[in-house]
């Protein structure tokens, strides 16, 4: 029996940790080539030995054998699917019913949230919130879907009194970056961490003495190396994607947590401003 089939059919037989491993492997099967048992263990908050035992439970000698088998199965499955159906997004194909599509999308987003939340270092997150709270000026950078996440965060921060710039034009982003000062904060949102526009802005911000906070993936990247602080996000999306759906879900979970943390830090005044904002917008109706 194929390992992917074994994993799908044995759900009720898995322990809590084994189910975490199974969910991760199914969601990230297209990216297993670059995943080690150590990385998995850190990301899932379990021991490496648990991963090895999981592989052996399925009949493999160890994680390496299981990983290579899964990669082979995924490649063969993709070739077969390519001949009969069009990939629409991630694992969703033109043969799927709307019910199946809904289940796949929901599971993809659930996994992105679960795996991102599992990575949070709350002491570091608290430090980041304190740094942002003291910033005279905040710049948020991002491209495409990440820019939408950034714009949403900028609206939330402005509502509670922060001075924020979040421009869609990359030339304006670069111009703002070079004008930052010591004490200012740049929040750079990029899942890949390698977009040249975002990296250029981060370089400029660091040069000016600003603090760079990156919301990015676990992968080593130019942005990750430039940042003073990183907030990690996980997305199970593959190269077969029509839009960064679960990536945005993961990023939004981080930015929403930052916002609520900042509200909590100055709760009385923040709630007053939120109330005033609500009253003003009600008058526009």
Swiss-Prot record:
State a single Gene Ontology molecular function.
DNA binding
Which pathway does the database say it acts in?
Amino-sugar metabolism; N-acetylmuramate degradation [regulation]
The superkingdom of the source organism is: Bacteria
Q: Where is the SIS domain?
A: 128-268
Q: Could you mention a single GO BP entry for this protein?
A: negative regulation of DNA-templated transcription
Cystine pairs: none
Q: Does the keyword Repressor feature in the UniProt annotation?
A: yes
The UniProt function text for this chain reads: Represses the expression of the murPQ operon involved in the uptake and degradation of N-acetylmuramic acid (MurNAc). Binds to two adjacent inverted repeats within the operator region. MurNAc 6-phosphate, the substrate of MurQ, is the specific inducer that weakens binding of MurR to the operator.
**Pfam families in UniProt:** HTH_6, SIS
The HTH rpiR-type domain covers which part of the protein? Answer: 1-77
Q: What name does UniProt use for this protein?
A: HTH-type transcriptional regulator MurR
PROSITE patterns on file: HTH_RPIR, SIS
InterPro entries, sorted: Homeodomain-like_sf (IPR009057), HTH_RpiR (IPR000281), RpiR-like (IPR047640), RpiR-like_SIS (IPR035472), SIS_dom (IPR001347), SIS_dom_sf (IPR046348), Tscrpt_reg_HTH_MurR (IPR022821), WH-like_DNA-bd_sf (IPR036388)
According to the record's subunit comment, the protein's assembly and interactions are: Homotetramer.
Task: Please list the residue ranges the record marks as binding DNA.
Answer: 37-56
Alphabetized, the UniProt keywords read:
Carbohydrate metabolism, DNA-binding, Repressor, Transcription, Transcription regulation
